[in-house]
Amino acid sequence: MELEVPDEAESAEAGAVPSEAAWAAESGAAAGLAQKKAAPTEVLSMTAQPGPGHGKKLGHRGVDASGETTYKKTTSSTLKGAIQLGIGYTVGHLSSKPERDVLMQDFYVVESIFFPSEGSNLTPAHHFQDFRFKTYAPVAFRYFRELFGIRPDDYLYSLCNEPLIELSNPGASGSLFYVTSDDEFIIKTVMHKEAEFLQKLLPGYYMNLNQNPRTLLPKFYGLYCVQSGGKNIRVVVMNNILPRVVKMHLKFDLKGSTYKRRASKKEKEKSFPTYKDLDFMQDMPEGLLLDADTFSALVKTLQRDCLVLESFKIMDYSLLLGVHNIDQHERERQAQGAQSTSDEKRPVGQKALYSTAMESIQGGAARGEAIESDDTMGGIPAVNGRGERLLLHIGIIDILQSYRFIKKLEHTWKALVHDGDTVSVHRPSFYAERFFKFMSNTVFRKNSSLKSSPSKKGRGGALLAVKPLGPTAAFSASQIPSEREEAQYDLRGARSYPTLEDEGRPDLLPCTPPSFEEATTASIATTLSSTSLSIPERSPSETSEQPRYRRRTQSSGQDGRPQEEPPAEEDLQQITVQVEPACSVEIVVPKEEDAGVEASPAGASAAVEVETASQASDEEGAPASQASDEEDAPATDIYFPTDERSWVYSPLHYSAQAPPASDGESDT
């Protein structure tokens, strides 16, 4: 473990730097490092950079005299070769070490290896200038990669087997972006402060991923540094949000603010511009319409992520939104005379779990099961106001911005000139609230006319059956989430929702708790599991697949034959459920037949006396006595459907009468 000192290049460009001619002479060795010829796409991406304004700099990114992109005076091809050589050695060396649990000191370890140009006993010879390669928290990042199902050989194959592809439209941050040839990973150069902040973030990031792997936050797979000629170039490996094989017709960078949140004229002239908040509100006033289940899962994931970012005091992050218009894509293909998609490049199955937008909110790739991605291509199905079918690719980006002194000063200065609530930079708590409200009310909206249909493998919500809307169809105000609906998305901790490791189908959406004291309901469902009680929502006649935590317990055998009469002491059971204002739940099951029914005078607790179905099958006039018992119960949580000999528990059933036989649903 070593303590890293910031290099002088972070504050000044001058220093002991090799000449650009020397670096340019060495730049052709990057492909030789990977022992492959440069792919045509890579050549195009690099030759597309130079233009009339070559030599201009944006941050540390620039263009040299030959037209090649540079970063801190280092050519892009040289940087790519050094990254591939360093990652190839460090990951291979780490895989030879036995696996173990992650310790606290593992988050602060920095391993360093020197790569002389002539080679050494540990490193191969290369055509670059001598450089040192640093790996931050190698054991911790190895755990993160394993958590997302990335094997070391797949990681090395994606990063080192093929040349990296430079993105021609990196954005205004001054960073360089590389994407692997299989669209799996993104490599981004980061500043010293961002790398330092990520190191401090790792323990909390580790805890958050353990509790909730379904997240829209960036998936960090590695943090490295190339040190050469007095320059430190730090890079981070992340998941790729926007796959290149899927054509994105629109791309948005959304923050929830309005001050200077419109794409500039220069940005709009690009072949693939990035629009902002005001552009979205102008072009899509109806928002993006999702079916109810997908909307609920997405909103919960967003709120959970906002809470995590707020706890880390992170602000100024964005939601990167890529929109693939299915109908427009089909029209474009028909205009080109294409009759089928057999000749088109189809997206291959990604190696990382939870890597696509749909998996991030549903966790559909758990337990090694492959998702049918031919139809959705990993995107979230939606429609726009014109009824066109869309696939959304989303993710939260730029989370390495903490609310430090400089950001506080920036917000204070902007607030003096403009409305402080409209500027981008703001305190983390306000920023998270504004970000979430904008996404859940303006960008994404619930449309009840959209229904989820299972795919070939029975994955609920994987495909979308869209009911076309007319071009003049107005957006109903009832589709906008109300305050009561928004309150239902309040977080109760990651473990309050079904996890992917639980028993049952792993692809089901998280169940939305009832509005009756969500924490109390979750506690009741957990506590009553030992007594075979659980919260139902739909009867088996309505659907053949019951969500987890929603079951019905039959007191008689499935074959319809009456059971033997149990002893008299077990015939009569009394279940007392007391719900106090403090959300405490007590369950008492006395064995005595003469136990009384307790009831709170304030009405905060409810008691009911239940006779088992085995006793009712032996007594004459059982339906009549059962109906009279239900009439005596003032506020029952347990009722008896008249069509079947079974009891159903519902925490929101306050009616003294059982529901009609034709309904078959609880009043949840």
Curated annotation (Swiss-Prot):
**A GO MF term:** 1-phosphatidylinositol-4-phosphate 5-kinase activity
Q: What is this protein called?
A: Phosphatidylinositol 4-phosphate 5-kinase type-1 gamma
Modified residue annotations for Phosphothreonine: 668
Ranges where the record places region Disordered: 45-67, 526-578, 593-642
Renumbered to this chain, region (Mediates interaction with TLN2) spans: 641-668
As for subcellular location, the record says: Cell membrane; Endomembrane system; Cytoplasm; Cell junction, Focal adhesion
Modification type Omega-N-methylarginine: residues = 459
